[in-house]
């Protein structure tokens, strides 16, 4: 909370998107609220909101299927717990993102099941008139690198495009689909714009996850390079803020 308060004091207008569901659960545990279940999670998120938290990222969802989760993501929070955190966040008025890590040991059926679960949670959120909801879905390709699953090949380019296109068709109740260029590569993100993505993320100067898993992953793009890539793909670049509102600079 001190970090949030300090940031808001120094930059009062800044929007803070922080803390994955995994980190929220960890905060509940170390603050002795982990045993309180949903109430403990709600207490933690409410306290973070009071000190400046504006929204949640979507990390940590991995793949919801229990078999896959137990085999590939031992020690991480379950899909059910991830959903609990985001459901509480939405009820408290926060928007969030949803992710899916694909291309490892899961099946295509597991991916579809994951998307259906996200879709159903968004439907519940809309039906209950929650002031928060999922803003974007982000399919993330598995990058073998030096992980424990390094012998796996990871998804092909065609598999990446199909997964994103299917997510856009299935998740029509989620406004945005992101082609996260730093994991997809900027070239793949260009193709994904043609397959249903409407967001490729920002400049990103350093992304520890991909840097650990693959030292060859490019870590930065200039604004000019991003705009050029978007235009080359046949689209007009638009700068947005965290809540997907268009940013205007110098009246443009």
Residue ranges of predicted features:
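Auxiliary Fe-S-binding modules of radical SAM enzymes
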Residues: 15, 29-32, 115-116, 123-252
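Conserved Radical SAM active-site core
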Residues: 1-120
């Amino acid at each position: 909370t001190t970090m949030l308060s300090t940031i808001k004091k120094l930059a009062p207008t800044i929007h803070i998107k922080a803390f994955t569901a995994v980190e929220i659960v960890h905060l509940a545990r170390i603050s002795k609220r982990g045993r309180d279940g949903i109430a403990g999670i709600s207490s933690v998120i409410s306290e973070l909101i009071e000190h400046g938290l504006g929204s949640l990222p979507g990390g940590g969802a991995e793949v919801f299927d229990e078999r896959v989760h137990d085999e590939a993501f031992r020690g991480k929070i379950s899909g059910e717990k991830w959903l609990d955190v985001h459901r509480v966040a939405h009820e408290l008025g926060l928007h969030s993102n949803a992710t899916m890590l694909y291309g490892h040991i899961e099946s295509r059926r597991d991916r579809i099941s994951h998307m259906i679960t996200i879709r159903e949670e968004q439907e519940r959120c809309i039906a209950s008139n929650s002031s928060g909801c999922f803003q974007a879905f982000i399919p993330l390709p598995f990058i073998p690198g030096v992980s424990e699953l390094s012998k796996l090949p990871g998804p092909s380019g065609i598999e990446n495009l199909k997964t994103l296109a299917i997510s856009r068709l299935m998740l029509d109740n989620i406004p945005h689909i992101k082609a996260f260029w730093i994991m997809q590569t900027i070239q793949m993100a260009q193709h994904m714009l043609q397959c249903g993505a409407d967001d490729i993320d920002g400049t990103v100067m350093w992304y520890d996850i991909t840097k650990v898993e693959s030292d060859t992953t490019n870590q930065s793009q200039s604004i000019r390079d991003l705009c050029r890539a978007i235009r080359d793909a046949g689209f007009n670049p638009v700068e947005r803020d965290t809540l997907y509102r268009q940013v205007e600079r110098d009246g443009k």
